[in-house]
Regions:
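A short acidic, Gly/Pro-enriched loop at the edge of an enzyme's catalytic core
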Residues: 123-133
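A short SAM/SAH-binding and catalytic strip from SAM-dependent methyltransferases
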Residues: 132-146
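A short glycine-rich, Lys/Arg-flanked "PGG" loop and its adjoining helix->strand segment in the class I
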Residues: 149-161
Length: 227
């Protein structure tokens, strides 16, 4: 894997977390009120996770019986709300600083565990151990297609058959990026998104927002979800 890119990602996100983690996680404002910051995460979960609960649960299972994975959890902005929905939530992030703050922000939640990742794998997480995976405003910052592909393959590995991975990528066109730009990541067209699904083992079930910053992808791991 691209060591230079991964090292730059970790270094940059540690620096951003030290400077102003809340702003770099959700840059609507530089002066977040703590309550409003986490409220913004609740709104994102309500808008981008709850509408899929029928297909996540398969119409039979309770979300309290499910294990969810958040790739790029940051300081736990959305993790807190996810933990109110699912029985267990694992958050992964490349930044030690972000994970440290996330641990403080979720210390009251016994069904959350947080893992410092290497930026491209989910090392230490068991095969077929999760029922749902989610990522928002994370992959849009990754400058390397190969790193994103590695993450998708790892999510495929840790999901149970039939499970959903919903995530957002940069879909804007005409942007100039380079391999060490950890803010403006690589962009995806619908064709490239389909290639990503196929190369990581998933089926591309749905997509929305092509050509915009918020290009959402619904990747399904083939198989039947079991109760």
């Amino acid at each position: 894997m691209e060591t230079k890119v991964l090292n730059k990602m970790r270094s940059d996100w540690n620096d951003r977390a030290k400077e102003n983690a809340q702003y770099y996680v959700q840059n609507a404002t530089k002066e977040w009120d703590q309550r409003e910051f986490f409220r913004s995460g609740e709104i994102n979960v309500a808008n981008d996770v709850l509408p899929d609960m029928g297909t996540i649960c398969g119409g039979q299972r309770s979300p309290l019986d499910l294990r969810a994975l958040e790739v790029g959890c940051g300081v736990g902005r959305m993790t807190r709300m996810l933990a109110r929905i699912f029985g267990h939530v694992t958050g992964v992030d490349i930044s030690e600083e972000m994970i440290g703050q996330a641990k403080r922000n979720t210390a009251d939640l016994p069904n959350v565990d947080l893992v410092l990742g290497d930026g491209c794998t989910l090392a230490g997480l068991a095969d077929s151990g999760y029922d749902y995976a989610f990522s928002f405003i994370v992959f849009q910052h990754i400058p390397s297609y190969e790193v994103i592909l590695s993450y998708c393959r790892e999510v495929f590995r840790v999901l149970r058959p039939g499970s959903l991975f919903k995530f957002q990528v940069q879909g804007g066109t005409g942007m100039q990026t380079n391999e060490l730009d950890t803010w403006l990541g690589c962009s995806f067209s619908p064709e490239r998104a389909l290639e990503l699904a196929r190369n990581s083992g998933f089926e591309l079930e749905h997509q929305a927002g092509a050509g915009t910053q918020y290009f959402w992808l619904w990747f399904r791991k083939p198989g039947i979800a079991t109760p």
